[in-house]
Amino acid sequence: MEKFTVLTGVAAPLRIMNVDTDMIIPARYLKTIKRTGLGAGLFSSLRFDDTGAERPDFVLNQRAYRNATILIAGDNFGCGSSREHAPWALLDYGIRCVIAPSFADIFFNNCFKNGILPIALPEPVVEKLMAAADNGANATFTVDLEAQRIAMPDGESIPFEVEPFRRECLLNGWDDIGLTLRQSERIDAYEARQRTEQPWALG
């Protein structure tokens, strides 16, 4: 998993509440277990019309936000079914941080496991960030996970909190497999001891 330390980039304001995982990545894209290639289907029902043409009014189709790495969204982001493809699609598109007043619990957890930083902030603060993001490519934000602060385009600093263990995992790029591998010496020692003490249990 890629480390998350400091992210500087354009933030796309998505003024929609209750964005569910089917809106993030529709079910027809769930046939794959690969984490790559899903960015093409991100928000596809919002980004494209029935003919496959882009909807010019959707934020990620606007020139200023096509390369956004931060998404600022409405309340209850990531609700609906617990599909891990949702954070995969965001990450494959290039989104590394999502800011919203609240998140669905499973989506929130899946973000941390896949290298995305979800930040929950009070609604008035999110509205302030969205207003600043309206300036498009002329407004860049910096999200500093180590300092737990968001630097707005005008220099104002917004604090946020991340649970210490999750923060450490993101800073170091540790997913579940990475955490297990960190214990490889202890696992090897345990298996060696088992072979000596209980050889019958190993067949």
UniProtKB/Swiss-Prot annotation:
Q: Name one Pfam family in it.
A: Aconitase_C
Q: Which reaction does it catalyse?
A: (2R,3S)-3-isopropylmalate = (2S)-2-isopropylmalate
Q: Name one GO biological process term.
A: L-leucine biosynthetic process
- Give the source's domain of life in one word: Bacteria
Q: Please name the pathway.
A: Amino-acid biosynthesis; L-leucine biosynthesis; L-leucine from 3-methyl-2-oxobutanoate: step 2/4
Specify whether Zinc-finger is a keyword of the entry: no
SUPFAM superfamilies this protein is in?
Answer: LeuD/IlvD-like (SSF52016)
Give the GO cellular component terms, alphabetically.
Answer: 3-isopropylmalate dehydratase complex
Q: Per the database entry, which stretches of residues form a coiled coil?
A: none
EC number(s) on file:
4.2.1.33
Q: Sorted alphabetically, which keywords does the UniProt record give?
A: Amino-acid biosynthesis, Branched-chain amino acid biosynthesis, Leucine biosynthesis, Lyase
EC category? lyase
Q: Which GO terms describe its molecular function?
A: 3-isopropylmalate dehydratase activity
Q: Which NCBIfam families match?
A: leuD (TIGR00171), PRK01641.1 (NF002458)
Q: How does it assemble?
A: Heterodimer of LeuC and LeuD.
Hey, which family's this protein in? Belongs to the LeuD family. LeuD type 1 subfamily.
Question: Entry's HAMAP family?
Answer: LeuD_type1 (MF_01031)
Q: Per its record, how is this protein called by name?
A: 3-isopropylmalate dehydratase small subunit
The protein's organism comes out as: Rhodospirillum centenum (strain ATCC 51521 / SW)
